[in-house]
């Protein structure tokens, strides 16, 4: 069995060393393609994020996600998420910081009109480049989600994924 997985992920999140009373604008874009024999799967995701840094190390806001999954020979599946997040940042120096994002919310998909909840915890490293621009690196996290649809058994997933994925992003913080 031959498997090809191409992933392009751009992660735009807040500047981890941002100052109090600043706005976070960001998100990520991802694409993957997988082919096994005659079967082909394509996945596209866009996940925006908006928040407010209310204390030197704390940010809270709203996050969302739109995912489109196309499988050869079947209907296209669409999945939507909307929820909140909170971020705690620990500066290590003027250049490096680590942060953790905790998010939770509502999700739905057009497959069997399923609806449910999600939650995730993602640790990351921030590298401050210049004037509020920086790079973010995360290598996985912990996540849980459930979906319950018409004529379909309830789905529950728990993931513990460290070191299997790498997300690299650009970030910018806007002061008020």
Ranges and model annotations:
Residues 31-49, 63, 150, 154-156:
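Surface-exposed strand-loop-strand hairpins of Gram-negative outer-membrane beta-barrel proteins
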Residues 31, 47-135, 167, 172-176:
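Gram-negative (and chloroplast) outer-membrane scaffold detector with strong preference
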Residues 141-176:
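Hydrophobic secondary-structure block in the mid-to-C-terminal portion of proteins
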Residues 1-22, 175-176:
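Cleavable N-terminal export/targeting peptides
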Residues 24-28:
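Short, hydrophobic/glycine-enriched beta-strand segments
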Residues 20-22, 39-43, 75-81, 112-118, ...:
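Transmembrane beta-barrel outer-membrane domains
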């Amino acid at each position: 069995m031959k498997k090809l997985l191409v992933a392009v992920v751009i992660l735009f999140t807040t500047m981890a060393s941002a100052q109090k009373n600043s706005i976070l604008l960001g998100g990520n874009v991802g694409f993957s393609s997988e082919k096994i024999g005659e079967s082909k799967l394509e996945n596209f995701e866009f996940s925006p994020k908006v928040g407010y840094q209310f204390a030197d190390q704390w940010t809270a806001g709203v996050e969302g996600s739109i995912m489109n999954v196309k499988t050869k020979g079947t209907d296209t599946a669409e999945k939507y998420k909307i929820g909140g997040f909170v971020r705690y940042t620990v500066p290590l120096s003027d250049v490096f910081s680590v942060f953790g994002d905790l998010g939770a919310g509502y999700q739905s998909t057009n497959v069997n009109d399923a609806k449910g909840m999600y939650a995730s915890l993602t640790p990351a490293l921030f590298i401050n480049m210049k004037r509020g621009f920086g790079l973010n690196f995360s290598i996985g996290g912990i996540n849980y989600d459930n979906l319950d649809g018409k004529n379909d058994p309830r789905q529950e997933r728990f993931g513990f994924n460290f070191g299997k994925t790498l997300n690299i992003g650009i970030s910018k913080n806007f002061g008020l």
